[in-house]
Amino acid sequence: NNTTDVKKICLAHGNEILKLSDENRILNSLNKADLIIYNSQFTKNKTFKNFKNLKKFNHKIIYPAFIKKISENKNNKKKYDLCTVARLEYRKGHHLVFEAMSILRNEYKIILKYAILGDGPELSRLKDLVLKFSLQKQVDFIHHDVSNEKIFKNSSVHIMPTITTPESIEGFGISNVEAASYGLPCIVSNSGGTPESIGNNGIIVKENNPKQLVKAIIDIFKKYKSYSRKSYLFANNFESNKKIKEYLNAI
């Protein structure tokens, strides 16, 4: 077989475009591709900014979330007000949710329950912060063996206030779309490609801003039914068959 007849497709997801120490190798790989598929407009823009000599043809944005099924979540007795389904990394912003919960409790007398599903290097530090903010009765760390579905079905809002660090960015935010498919409104920050993972089914706040998180949480619950309905509609855009067609049309 002549390998030159095989179409070469490159998927760009975010963090790899920060590795400027590997600039020549990455640029060479990108320029060999017949098509580059980005997981967000942010990732595409960042790639062109970091790699000035990138060829300007055959670039496509396809959001990577695939939703197999959207069904109404009829659980009206949810255990958690907030949840975050994500790897336990600093850039995911769990610590900012703790700060917001502390403000809500101390200044607004609002007590929320928060589920964190995931594993990662921040676990020990996050547990220390729970003690610092006296949130032991409000925050549960869920073992990663528990399914995303179980957490989403038992939570009201998905919150992921990501922050940008020199070595890491959020290219998109698949868990926000997955949460929306269970009717959860989403609160995210304006960091990286995260804002592209929600529509009118949530609120975008400035990154690293607990006070804006507080306002967003209050606003979401004031209009909860409306945001929840919009979440189902938004998630429908990521239904598996639609996404497969996007990829097939691209290649």
Language model region names:
Residues 37, 74-92, 98-101:
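Conserved donor-binding/catalytic core segment of Leloir-type glycosyltransferases
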Residues 70-71, 208, 222-251:
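A charged, aromatic-enriched C-terminal amphipathic alpha-helix characteristic of glycosyltransferases
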Residues 176, 181, 185-188:
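Short hydrophobic beta-strand element within catalytic cores of glycosyltransferases
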Residues 190, 200-210, 219-224:
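Conserved acidic donor-binding segment of nucleotide-sugar-dependent glycosyltransferases
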Residues 153-169, 184:
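Acidic donor-binding loop of glycosyltransferase active sites
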Residues 31-71:
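Donor nucleotide-sugar binding/catalytic pocket of nucleotide-sugar-dependent glycosyltransferases
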Residues 124-145, 157:
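Nucleotide-activated donor-binding/catalytic signature segment of Leloir-type glycosyltransferases, i.e.
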Residues 82, 97-100, 114, 213, ...:
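A structural motif in glycosyltransferase catalytic domains
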